[in-house]
Amino acid sequence: MAEFVRAQIFGTTFEITSRYTDLQPVGMGAFGLVCSARDQLTAQPVAVKKIMKPFSTPVLSKRTYRELKLLKHLRHENIISLSDIFISPLEDIYFVTELLGTDLHRLISSRPLEKQFIQYFLYQIMRGLKYVHSAGVVHRDLKPSNILINENCDLKICDFGLARIQDPQMTGYVSTRYYRAPEIMLTWQKYDAKVDVWSAACIFAEMLLGAPLFPGKDHVNQFSIITELLGTPPDDVIQTICSENTLRFVKSLPKREPQDLAKLPKFLALVHPDKKPEEDEDYKNTINLLKAMLVYNPKDRISAEAALAAPYLAPYHDETDEPVAEEKFDWSFNDADLPVDTWKIMMYSEILDFHNIDQGGDINPALVEGAGLNQQGFQ
């Protein structure tokens, strides 16, 4: 049995194994608190995420199980990787991952980003999305604060708690407003991996401009701001709207023509000072990729894989080093409506599997407390 120690962080009890020391809070979300820590086994800094009350409701249990399964399955240089997981005696779940120094939101807020950094960051985002989408997974909540970066400019996408299967009937009200694709706002159904490409486009523009491209105050204002830039949605998009209220709202908006992004003052500021916009190939490549990502109809929106081959990302593009998933993620559990105790047993099973512990018969929850800490040289 592993030895557990307790610490109070922001009024929350962190109950972790003695393997991890020097806890410092780094962030808090709706579903968990994240601390940095030192891994005594590897002498490396790590991030320890406490999942708040994972077994309080079936919905939270399922969400935690989904995130655990995804973190186990997704193995890619641009996706955060799981190094340890355990359940404390208080039945809180802790995910341990690599620690990166900052996130893209903090970086954008602190200083203007130079062109080569924007290119490299976008390349890594799209490289990660190509892999995620090839696994049959849609992130659904891509935003600057979910994109982690270290001192070497290595980038990793994190927080897969809202991720879902690629399904033409996918539904739900997801994604932080500024980065939300129009098909989510308009239909609440029939969307796919292209919602992540839209979010990536909004992040791309934010890196270029230093401020959100579509800073809507609410759901209605958000869509109105999008139409100011991209014009009224075309008929083929409007025809997909299923909600009568949404359809009435869209038809009530004034008819707007799309603006030419390349001629907008906020983008013209990106043109090389010694060149005209039409002479600046880098500028044209920048705007062309952004336009291809900001298309109303997801069928016509560029994919993550195709974006990697765009001229803007040519300095980094290498098709032989942009892997896809070896197999699709198994979503068979996703439609299950199960009680908490069943999700708990399934969670225990996944944790034991992560630590390569033979489950042999009934699962004993006590085995999972600090699971794996006596395996493979662990403390």
UniProtKB/Swiss-Prot annotation:
Active site per the UniProt annotation: 141 (proton acceptor)
Chain positions with Phosphothreonine modification: 171
GO cellular component, one term: cytoplasm
Catalytic activity: L-seryl-[protein] + ATP = O-phospho-L-seryl-[protein] + ADP + H(+); L-threonyl-[protein] + ATP = O-phospho-L-threonyl-[protein] + ADP + H(+)
SUPFAM superfamilies: Protein kinase-like (PK-like)
Segments carrying motif TXY: 171-173
Residues modified to Phosphotyrosine: 173
Pfam family, one: Pkinase
Keyword annotations: Activator, ATP-binding, Cytoplasm, Kinase, Nucleotide-binding, Nucleus, Phosphoprotein, Serine/threonine-protein kinase, Transcription, Transcription regulation, Transferase
UniProt KW Transcription regulation keyword: yes
UniProt EC number: 2.7.11.24
Written domain comment of the UniProt record: The TXY motif contains the threonine and tyrosine residues whose phosphorylation activates the MAP kinases.
Protein name: Mitogen-activated protein kinase hog1
Source organism per UniProt: Emericella nidulans (strain FGSC A4 / ATCC 38163 / CBS 112.46 / NRRL 194 / M139)
Lineage summary: Eukaryota, Fungi, Dikarya, Ascomycota, Pezizomycotina
